[in-house]
Amino acid sequence: MTSFAVVARLITRAPRVRASVPTRLVHGTTSTRKDSVCDKATEAQQKVAKKADEGAQTISDAAGNLKDKAKNTAEEAWDKVKDTTEKIKDTVTGKTEETKESIKATAKTVERSMNTKNLK
């Protein structure tokens, strides 16, 4: 791309702001007319600056909202992980107790069986 094409492309992608300011002053005007044009130009510049500030504030608010949503989502996910881990622990502990009781019962049965055989 030529440098002109690059500049043309950048210009077409730039945000556009329209303000009604005459492109040239008319000769022989009074100072009040000049002041009026200058006031209009200043007013247009202030409007553009105000719009830019409003846009920046909107973007800042949106970023803050996204940050809060991400934080809440992470906290909810962490709470779910903790709950699931607790359920797994309770299940494993319960099964361990059942297995322990089953082993004790089997050991007593084997012991009785051995005692019965030894008596005969």
From Swiss-Prot:
Record's GO cellular component terms: cytosol
Ranges annotated as biased composition (Basic and acidic residues): 90-103
Signal peptide start and end residues: 1-19
Superkingdom of origin organism: Eukaryota
Residue ranges of the region described as Disordered: 48-71, 90-120
Keywords, comma-separated and alphabetical: Signal
Name used for this protein in its record: Uncharacterized protein At4g13230
Organism the protein comes from: Arabidopsis thaliana (Mouse-ear cress)
Taxonomic placement: Eukaryota, Viridiplantae, Streptophyta, Embryophyta, Tracheophyta
